[in-house]
Amino acid sequence: MRKKRRGFLNASTAVLVGILAGFLGVVLAATGALGFAVRESLLLKQFLFLSFEGNTDGASPFGKDVVVTASQDVAADGEYSLKVENRTSVWDGVEIDLTGKVNTGTDYLLSFHVYQTSDSPQLFSVLARTEDEKGERYKILADKVVVPNYWKEILVPFSPTFEGTPAKFSLIITSPKKTDFVFYVDNVQVLTPKEAGPKVVYETSFEKGIGDWQPRGSDVKISISPKVAHSGKKSLFVSNRQKGWHGAQISLKGILKTGKTYAFEAWVYQESGQDQTIIMTMQRKYSSDSSTKYEWIKAATVPSGQWVQLSGTYTIPAGVTVEDLTLYFESQNPTLEFYVDDVKVVDTTSAEIKLEMNPEEEIPALKDVLKDYFRVGVALPSKVFINQKDIALISKHSNSSTAENEMKPDSLLAGIENGKLKFRFETADKYIEFAQQNGMVVRGHTLVWHNQTPEWFFKDENGNLLSKEEMTERLREYIHTVVGHFKGKVYAWDVVNEAVDPNQPDGLRRSTWYQIMGPDYIELAFKFAREADPNAKLFYNDYNTFEPKKRDIIYNLVKSLKEKGLIDGIGMQCHISLATDIRQIEEAIKKFSTIPGIEIHITELDISVYRDSTSNYSEAPRTALIEQAHKMAQLFKIFKKYSNVITNVTFWGLKDDYSWRATRRNDWPLIFDKDYQAKLAYWAIVAPEVLPPLPKESKISEGEAVVVGMMDDSYMMSKPIEIYDEEGNVKATIRAIWKDSTIYVYGEVQDATKKPAEDGVAIFINPNNERTPYLQPDDTYVVLWTNWKSEVNREDVEVKKFVGPGFRRYSFEMSITIPGVEFKKDSYIGFDVAVIDDGKWYSWSDTTNSQKTNTMNYGTLKLEGVMVATAKYGTPVIDGEIDDIWNTTEEIETKSVAMGSLEKNATAKVRVLWDEENLYVLAIVKDPVLNKDNSNPWEQDSVEIFIDENNHKTGYYEDDDAQFRVNYMNEQSFGTGASAARFKTAVKLIEGGYIVEAAIKWKTIKPSPNTVIGFNVQVNDANEKGQRVGIISWSDPTNNSWRDPSKFGNLRLIK
């Protein structure tokens, strides 16, 4: 028998150096052939190694029926591995006891190999189990998908935290989706770092002067200033800037080495009085580059008068010859003065785990998985052509490519000489060569855009804007030259990019193109492109194409061009986030597909892990990555559904650290991580059934109900919970409320069959909201069948119930009173609900349907008070005067701050009335500085009114939802669902502000007393420079009411 090597980490093709800082809780998986070892003499030391050669080495079963044995069936190394079988619960597995062996706050690395015998990919998870003075708790550390019959190494950094001396600490390896297969574990190792510190290669606090820093741009001034400092007494002051790229710079050539990743830190400060964007950028040129590149390391919003840290990483590939590496600081505001302090550059080779990992060879190729549906594309920076790992990942998964920047006008234009444009095609030609070598097609991006086009392109030799005739000829020359150069090599072009602005009267962006040529430039661009290459497919490309107003403008534009034979398709960019409602994307695809003969390309797909524009995670939260994956699965289900019109889906970036989104803040928007490993978002496309359940979140209002099978008004105050079937259709809509120790639930279920003993609903409540792989004593569930029979897991729980029959549907109501529990406002409980149809379960949160045995995947409900106001019946005169009738109804105030503060920004006191024809709103706005200079109406001093007539509180706008806006000069503008025909307003300026009176015509309901609608009112505050500095509403602190009615409050109509 060959003995296993002790003292090694078999990190298949992985090189690990350094400590674990910054990687805690993130799974890192290596791939490839086994056999490359990292010796203990490097910066990691091993203190636990389980080889399972002839025995279980102390590993124990987790789960009452689980059997673990040393087995010779298969082995990653040596002749034995640990066999795990007879699992009956999804969280059953093998437990590695580390009690007394690890310390709180210390960084560790778990490494193990796993092999599974099912016939499809399976999800594996690692849990940390802790028992200490705080009690027993479980935390999921990592998720990784493993293909059948393949030894996969999984690496899991962890750092335990104990309260007092722990009675138990262990790690559990399990496969939490299915139990009907055997898996094996081998080479379990736990390592900890030896002493090692980061290597600082450059650092300055400017206390000793400017050093090697230089002004960037003519006339720019840099100086040492004692006025402000992040540390010490001095900082670097940058002034007299005239362009965005002007700033302060330092050459790092000779300091930074090839084949290394560096961490950059700096602190920046500005005092303009407004938020500003300041950017840390690397200017670089390798001998293989045809031109100098400018790559953001980090951009951040910097509030006035605050020091903000910019931090990011930058990698210099091995094997390149460096000609220029210059670090500089810039701002999108070309005249902004700013300060820089405490700049530091760290060689992370000695500061982190660095995994030199290869693309996973064993996973399916995306282009093969989707070959019957559409091409799979990827947007590429030119640096991939010198990186063999990049090339391997691209060629395995993609059959279409797009130049990320190198086919845009500013990359192709080299100047103008004697009135003729000069071009540079060297870098762009590399994309053609690469595609041809790897069996790929090329999408050209982009010909006509308001951005990344040089200013001189629109001007004559004297700096004056060209005439329409001159601009038309320049457009013709540019398109004929570029498209002609790539004729027969680029199969599709984004001819016009981002020309639509739904806030303009004609729906078109007021770009320099429009300024000179009016709307004609769009049609001419397509005409010239068709002339230059009749066989190329021509597309109009834009972002947020799913927003209803913008969608409709694009539809009309493209339909007109299609009827003229000038266009072939629509490019839907799909730069989306976790806040995006995927149903709106399907509605857009559905509408666009009605244009005869149209093609659709998904041109720039990525999914941010954020819901807002301000958060910034140091590491991607597990729940965000799971939600991202579920969004991706939804998307590709839709893309496949419409594959008769969708012919190309392109990801905007190869892997997370190459994404444009990661330069602005930490983000992980793509399907491969920075180490070339497939994320859950990849498996969402290939095998969505393996995804971990996405624990849902919602909120319910306080209230009581009489359980008689009718939806009391109290239920209307809570956001509905929807359960979907396999096709994405709503299976059930459920509302819950809480009071004291009782949860009330009312629901309506779609069910075409009548099988009383096999149809029903199940409610699961986890009062302490602790997640465990078993039920705790307080966990409660009730199953109610449509024959009125029920199953309750606790004898002391009081249940009242009602089932109401209907045609192809039924309703139910329950109250569940749990003794010894007192629910409280602003607390959280675990919760789930499932619909049972003909014996099949459809769950809201735990899609493994294992709620009866564990609470790991229950959803979370926040218990809230009631956000409700009343509107009295009455009809005012809309004239800007405050009629006496307004004093008969309740006054509410805008106090939910999304931007600014209650003390410094505009707020309003609001009253609401109603009659059979209209909803009436009076807003008395406190705002001493009034401005409407901004071209965006939402950034002017204005009042916005949001209504949700059916109060469904969906996460997207239904037909009854609407957003109305009026500024202090009585100029109206509209969001989704609103129109001038429904909106009558009057505005009066008063000392210190203005009064708004508005009437909004009902659209879908006939109101009556006790009707409850969704409602919000928002005040936008602009400063004297026309910048929006305040957003304060009645009910929504997230500033998402414009797209998400679930943020609205409740308005009850009374007599």
Swiss-Prot record:
Activity relative to temperature: Optimum temperature is 102 degrees Celsius. Thermostable.
Boundaries of every CBM-cenC domain copy: 720-851, 895-1040
Source lineage: Bacteria, Thermotogati, Thermotogota, Thermotogae, Thermotogales
Protein name: Endo-1,4-beta-xylanase A
Domain GH10: 360-688
E.C. number(s) listed in UniProt: 3.2.1.8
UniProt catalytic activity: Endohydrolysis of (1->4)-beta-D-xylosidic linkages in xylans
Keywords assigned by UniProt, alphabetized: Carbohydrate metabolism, Glycosidase, Hydrolase, Polysaccharide degradation, Repeat, Signal, Xylan degradation
Disulfide bonding pattern of the chain: none
Signal peptide: 1-29
Keyword Signal annotated: yes
Domain notes: The C-terminal CBM-CenC domains mediate the binding of XynA to microcrystalline cellulose. CBM-CenC 2 alone can also promote cellulose binding.
